[in-house]
Design a protein with these regions (language model features):
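N-terminal auxiliary "cap/dimerization" subdomain that precedes the catalytic jelly-roll/cupin core
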Residues: 1-95
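Generic detector of solvent-exposed, compositionally biased contiguous segments
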Residues: 4-5, 78-79, 126-146, 191-212
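A general structural signal for short secondary-structure junctions and capping/turn motifs
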Residues: 17-19, 62-63, 127-129, 149-151, ...
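Short, solvent-exposed loop/turn segments at secondary-structure junctions
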Residues: 32-34, 142, 164, 179, ...
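Signature of the catalytic double-stranded beta-helix
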Residues: 72-134
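Structured loops at beta-to-helix junctions and adjacent beta-edge loops in soluble globular domains
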Residues: 76, 140, 162, 202, ...
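Catalytic core of non-heme Fe(II) oxygenases with the double-stranded beta-helix
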Residues: 129-194
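Catalytic core of Fe(II)/2-oxoglutarate
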Residues: 171-243
Length: 243
């Protein structure tokens, strides 16, 4: 990365950190963060079009194809150490009770994906970073409803990175957290993420979701997205103590 590109990316990180501090969310792009050209296209071709996704019975929305990875990270003097975590299991998510284990993709074997994970973890302001934690990466392809309803993921931060979209709709929204239905809170964001665009937000402050996809004339709608979670300690590392 050239010096000028590094400086621009560092300035963009500071802007994202300030947005999170002020508003609880921030929008950015792969270009502003200094990610490699065609990063989204490369990831889509390798994982989404490369036969790495699958549909699991009972998953919602019913037309979703997905894969997942979980990475253990540690910060040391501003540097990250990454390794694959021992499990990708999730429990009691999306109104589905019990344990689920989806298709795993070992992203750290891919240098570009590993660099992307480092960049995503750097989006978290330094004062909010856990010294050691887990990072979930969900690869979702959907054709109709992106999500079933406004919700929390019960994690620390959520990152959305859209790789590709065919058709319209899929407008991401955030409502300020209030007890009861999400619509009773103030909507603070409604934005259609285009390929190469990202959003990060603090999960506890908002209920989030997205509008349904609308197919193009004579075609089929599709959205390929990474939904990443900077996990709370209780998701994995402290799970045994709270079970």
């Amino acid at each position: 990365m050239a010096d000028e590109t590094r400086r621009a990316a560092a300035a963009e990180l500071r802007r994202v950190h300030q947005g999170l501090a002020d508003d609880g969310f921030a929008l950015t792009t792969e270009w502003d963060l200094g990610l490699p050209p065609k990063c989204a296209k490369n990831l889509q071709g390798t994982y989404f079009d490369g036969g790495r996704l699958r549909h699991d019975d009972g998953d919602m929305p019913a037309d979703r194809e997905r894969a997942r990875d979980v990475v253990l990270y540690e910060w040391h003097d501003g540097k990250l150490a990454l390794e694959e975590y021992e499990t990708i299991a999730i429990w009691d998510r999306s109104d589905i009770k019990g344990e689920r284990i989806h298709q795993r993709v070992a992203l750290l074997q891919d240098p570009q994906a590993a660099d992307l994970i480092e960049t995503f973890l750097s989006l978290v302001p330094e004062q909010r970073r856990q010294a050691r934690g887990t990072f979930g990466i969900n690869l979702f392809r959907t054709h109709s409803n992106v999500v079933t309803k406004p919700h929390h993921d019960e994690e620390d931060f959520i990152i959305l990175y859209v790789l590709d979209r065919e058709g319209d709709g899929a407008e991401s929204y955030l409502y300020k957290h209030e007890e009861g239905d999400a619509e009773t809170g103030e909507q603070v964001l409604r934005h259609q993420l285009n390929p190469g665009e990202l959003m990060i937000f603090e999960d506890s402050r908002f209920k989030h979701g997205a509008t349904p996809l609308t197919p193009p004339a004579g075609g089929q709608a599709k959205r390929d997205v990474l939904v990443c979670t900077v996990d709370l300690p209780t998701t994995y590392l402290q799970r045994a103590t709270v079970s």
